[in-house]
């Protein structure tokens, strides 16, 4: 196993070098102000860290003098091993970029782990495309239609609680849709190809539309006051505002009975959607438990 070339460095500096590499690999670029803002260091210290990273991994980074930024090198090879879960938490919450997760928790705590994780190389190509506004050529593997080649314009990651998706405009179907990250292979940026106006996220009606959902204790529950306590329901109603593109995933994750007559049975259905018409024309409503619709956006 190759020795860690940063092992002799102080931990704070190793953390900054790791941050440089994360930005290069998953955003495609890093600038001196990124380090200054993230770590509260002086400009001179940020310059030294960037110079040191380039010295340790010269193939990983190219300097663009015009934009005063460091870009991902064509022969990039990571210095740091990072789990995909840690990368995703950093991308979505700015957490976990400094140190590896501790093997010892402060308190005993158990949580279900994900059964699947996206490959880091695929994830990196997609996140760079999102950050830089690139068009991607991909091979996509669908449960219903098998493998196909597509061009997509990605703009956001979606965590459904079970797996990760990328929201993108699909040039093959000429629609906005969700693609499961683990089903994407051979992602390649189409350099010089820019997104047309109708392919941009502000044109995605399901993305820009916000739906307001009122959830109440399921009428079949003998003790609704317990649900009031669990979900901190003022007035017995939990009001949510969600993007239409995310609504169906969220309702499925929370096992919300979305049938008009609260007809679903079982202890898992603690909540009921008070007005199922709130999901009218929401494409992901097909995923909502009990919702009376046969239309959806299966990918």
Predicted regions and their residues:
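Core beta-strand-centered patch of the WYL/Sm-like small regulatory domain
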Residues: 104-105, 109-229
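Conserved short hydrophobic interaction patches
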Residues: 53-56, 187, 253-257
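Polybasic (Lys/Arg-rich)
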Residues: 208-299
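Bulky hydrophobic/aromatic content
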Residues: 72-141, 253, 260-264, 268-273, ...
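Short, basic/aromatic recognition patches that contact phosphate-bearing ligands
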Residues: 1-82, 215, 264-299
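Long, contiguous hydrophobic alpha-helical segments, chiefly transmembrane helices and signal peptides
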Residues: 46, 53, 158, 164-168, ...
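A generic structural signal for beta-strand entry/edge sites
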Residues: 67-69, 163, 237
């Amino acid at each position: 196993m190759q020795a860690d070339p940063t092992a002799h460095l102080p931990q704070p500096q190793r953390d900054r070098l790791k941050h440089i590499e994360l930005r290069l690999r998953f955003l495609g670029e890093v600038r001196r102000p990124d380090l200054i803002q993230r770590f509260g260091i002086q400009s001179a210290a940020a310059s030294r860290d960037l110079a040191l990273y380039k010295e340790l991994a010269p193939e990983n980074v190219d300097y663009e003098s015009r934009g005063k930024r460091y870009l991902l090198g064509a022969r990039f090879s990571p210095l740091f091993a990072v789990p995909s879960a840690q990368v995703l938490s950093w991308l979505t919450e700015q957490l976990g970029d400094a140190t590896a997760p501790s093997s010892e928790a402060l308190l005993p705590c158990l949580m279900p782990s994900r059964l699947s994780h996206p490959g880091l190389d695929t994830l990196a190509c997609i996140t760079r495309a999102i950050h830089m506004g690139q068009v991607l050529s991909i091979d996509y593997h669908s449960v219903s239609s098998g493998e196909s080649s597509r061009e997509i314009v990605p703009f956001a990651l979606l965590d459904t609680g079970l797996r990760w998706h990328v929201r993108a405009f699909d040039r093959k179907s000429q629609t906005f849709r969700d693609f499961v990250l683990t089903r994407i292979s051979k992602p390649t940026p189409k350099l010089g190809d820019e997104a047309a106006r109708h392919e941009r996220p502000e044109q995605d009606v399901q993305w820009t539309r916000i739906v307001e959902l009122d959830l109440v204790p399921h009428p079949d529950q003998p003790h609704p006051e317990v649900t009031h306590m669990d979900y901190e329901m003022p007035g017995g109603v939990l009001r949510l505002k969600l993007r239409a593109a995310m609504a169906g995933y969220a309702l499925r994750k929370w096992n919300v009975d979305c049938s008009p007559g609260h007809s679903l049975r079982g202890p898992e259905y603690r909540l009921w959607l008070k007005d199922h018409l709130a999901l009218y024309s929401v494409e992901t409503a097909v995923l909502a438990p009990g919702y009376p619709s046969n239309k959806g956006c299966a990918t």
